Amino acid sequence: RPFWMWGAEMGVNEHGVVIGNEAVFTKLKVAKNKVLTGMDLLRLALERSNSAATAKQLIIDLLQEFGQGGVGGYQDKNFKYHNSFLIADKTEAWVLETAGIYWATKKVDDFYAISNALTIGEDFDDIHPEAIAFANKKGWVKGAFSFSKAFSDYLYTTFSGSKARQCRASELLKSNYFKIDVTSSMAHLRNHHDADFTPSKSLIGNSICAHAANAISRHASQTTSAMIVHLTADKPTVWVTATSAPCLSVFKPMWFTGMVIPDL
């Protein structure tokens, strides 16, 4: 939870429902006032749901009733965006991606990575009932309908470095598919795209573990926290850095026990 807002960018509740949120950039105008931020939607879903399926539906319902947008930057009050969500519990996981009031969902079969881009194409499992007709009316559909191709804003999505991060995360998950555990997940979250990486070398934020640099394009590209949730039949174990730069941070375990963990 960023200190300056009510909502949260990632979290887990006592039922083992886990949600992560990412900003995405679309062709639709982003409302600034009297709407819910993506972080509001995430927190409300965690407060009110007991499964990934109910969390997914709750976000969709809130999206239709209140819309989304708001101020997305602490200092830059003009920074606005739409949202994507990765939602999981101990039995299933879903990707929910949005553009204004429109949305598409996809059930995760094995592994999935989201970044600052729409990723659901033709293979959605469910979609807003008017999304395809709306995109066709706007002239955004070329050939078979793809949610990401129809609704993505090319410029902001490209310069966010989202494709490189999403591809790198997917590559790491695929190469370690049969041995994904807490330890390997920590390594993934500490990953830089090159072995000789230094923050000043990259013009865009293309590392999973991002470091702010270059005042023009990457002054705000800093990983400020990281979280891993180990879901089991019992209560989840939550590993958090609670500090920026995962490559320099220690992951601390937390549990839902009803008692306050003493300072480490």
Language model features by range: what are they?
Residues 1-38, 58-183, 237-239:
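A contiguous strand-loop segment
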Residues 31, 41-49:
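Second-shell loop/turn segments in exported
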Residues 48-56:
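Short, charged, surface-exposed loops that flank catalytic or proteolytic processing sites
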Residues 57-58, 188:
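Generic alpha-helical secondary-structure signal
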Residues 165-224:
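Accessory "access/gating" subregions that flank catalytic or transport cores
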